[in-house]
Amino acid sequence: MTPIILLDDLQKFIEENTKDILLEVRTRTGTDTEKERAAKVYKMGLPEKDDTTQQIPYILLKVLTGADEQEERQPKSGEVRVRMMIATYSQDGEQGPLALLNIILRIRERLQKQHIIGGRFCLKYPFEYIIYQDTTPPYYLGEIMTRWSIPTIEREVKKLWQ
């Protein structure tokens, strides 16, 4: 459950810290839909598979790996890797990648300032991000790779030899 709680806390944190960045939205001809909005934040997958380009702009949070370790004479530690996939749209070949970079740098700045999310998940380094150079305009994609230390599960069984 802990990685799911991390995703929930990250979703709230990112929504709160990016809500003022309005991004271009692709509109269908003849519709009266919004032309700008903040990126929507999703966990593990987009809600409608057939309409992925209509979801843009978005930030998709995905747990990639998790591990619990205990080195000799050390307390247990847990770690989860989370990938944040960011997609933006723009007809302007300069503004699209800049909007993408702006979102990535905002998330980077706010996460590194706060460092702890939900009172229990600690950001670890390295903090990595990439802007994909081979994306097809008018869609621009990038991602952030993060590592988080997470609480571990403790044994509930009492030691018999005590």
For the regions a protein language model found, what residue spans apply to each?
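Catalytic micro-motifs at enzyme active sites that drive phosphoryl/nucleotidyl and oxygen chemistry
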Residues: 48, 67-74, 127-137
